[in-house]
């Protein structure tokens, strides 16, 4: 559906995109994540040639946008919609007129415009706001208007540039649920860029990680846990892993005692079996659960435990082997000293 081949883009001699190669499948929700300045927004704007790459090809639905005339590029963009962090609504226009704007620019008949808006308003849950002005709407409602406007010309691709970063957590959840519903309802390919892993894990099937203008990793969300060196996996782990309390970290040593502190990451079926109790019985060892969390990523259940073991080095090795056999990732965080030392 979307294929980027050898993209490069510079600003004032500084390379913003460096040899980007990426394929996004039709109908998927694809996330691009990275820190500020990684090149995410530039990449997104190159997909619809709002920023023209210095080198490379942008192929959408079999058509190379880089080779099109200005007129044909404008026509191709009709099928590529975009929403932003800021809603960019016309304050002097009603919700109806804001949604109608792209269709009126294309010269679509007013009766067809009315039909399309009447179709879209229930989808974005704004049926009762048709005649309201932006000043009368909440931030989430404004973004829903922007989404309806983006859908008005029946695009095949929806580009989302930090579309939830200006919203509170509850509204963010609602907008992400709406994007997922739109994907399922219309089969639109959604490309979403963000610096928040929580956004990616909520709705994306696959993701790319960007660092300094390069894509350093592309993976299915459900495969992250099978890649020990995955940067995306480390980002997910950091998000779901509970933070160790100060009262515990100040008692940690890097030399071996018989109280190793271990973090365990579970995935899929391993997250639902009574592994701790079984292992405690099999190895005849005490396992004290200190912290725990469980979450879901693209339908896959994942969990993290921080446990304190009562184990000498040989027993710790047996515990680690038992975890690895069960497909559980193990990280020894340190060794707990007696309180007061």
Swiss-Prot record:
Indicate where this protein resides in the cell: Cell inner membrane
Main EC class the enzyme belongs to: translocase
Q: Which reaction does it catalyse?
A: L-methionine(out) + ATP + H2O = L-methionine(in) + ADP + phosphate + H(+); D-methionine(out) + ATP + H2O = D-methionine(in) + ADP + phosphate + H(+)
**Which molecular function term from Gene Ontology is one that the record holds?**
ATP hydrolysis activity
- Binding annotation for ATP: 34-41
Enzyme Commission numbers on file: 7.4.2.11
As for what it does, the entry says:
Part of the ABC transporter complex MetNIQ involved in methionine import. Responsible for energy coupling to the transport system.
> What name does this protein carry?
Methionine import ATP-binding protein MetN
Task: Please tell me the species this chain comes from.
Answer: Legionella pneumophila (strain Paris)
